[in-house]
């Protein structure tokens, strides 16, 4: 009987220790996930929205619904006759087509 009681106490102790370790791991994972979300939110605040100028930061465009916007550049001739490059964040045509197909698929299949 003493052996069963000792074994039971040992089992309860090990179980409580392992569950405490698991809870610590979950808490650490929650903290890491929260920090990751905060960092992503900060990066989102610093990104350049759609149709805004990205000439100085060509890799800083925000994310769209499915894809990240791309910095699209064109050459513009000013009134003085000088050619300059102007860029804006936008959705490339192949991304627009993919978003259209996905949207159409969602409407059909729910």
Curated annotation (Swiss-Prot):
Q: Which residues form the propeptide?
A: 21-44
What main location does UniProt list?
secreted
Q: Which GO terms describe its cellular component?
A: extracellular region
Disulphide-bonded residues: 47-62, 54-71, 61-89, 73-87
Region forming the signal peptide? 1-20
A Pfam short name: Toxin_35
Keywords assigned: Disulfide bond, Knottin, Secreted, Signal, Toxin
The record's GO molecular-function terms, alphabetically, read: toxin activity
> Where does it localize?
Secreted
Organs and tissues of expression: Expressed by the venom gland.
The written remark on domains in the entry is: The presence of a 'disulfide through disulfide knot' structurally defines this protein as a knottin.
Give the family from UniProt: Belongs to the neurotoxin 19 (CSTX) family. 03 subfamily.
Record protein name field: U1-lycotoxin-Ls1ii
Q: What is the lineage of its organism?
A: Eukaryota, Metazoa, Ecdysozoa, Arthropoda, Chelicerata
């Amino acid at each position: 009987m003493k052996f069963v009681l000792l074994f039971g106490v040992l089992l309860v102790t090990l179980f409580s220790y392992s569950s405490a370790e698991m809870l610590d791991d979950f808490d650490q994972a929650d903290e890491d996930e929260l920090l990751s979300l905060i960092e992503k939110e900060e990066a989102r605040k610093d990104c350049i929205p759609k149709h805004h100028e990205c000439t100085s930061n060509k890799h800083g465009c925000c994310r769209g619904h499915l894809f990240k916007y791309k910095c699209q550049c064109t050459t513009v001739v000013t009134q003085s006759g000088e050619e300059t490059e102007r860029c804006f964040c936008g959705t490339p045509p192949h991304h627009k087509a993919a978003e259209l197909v996905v949207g159409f698929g969602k409407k059909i299949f729910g």
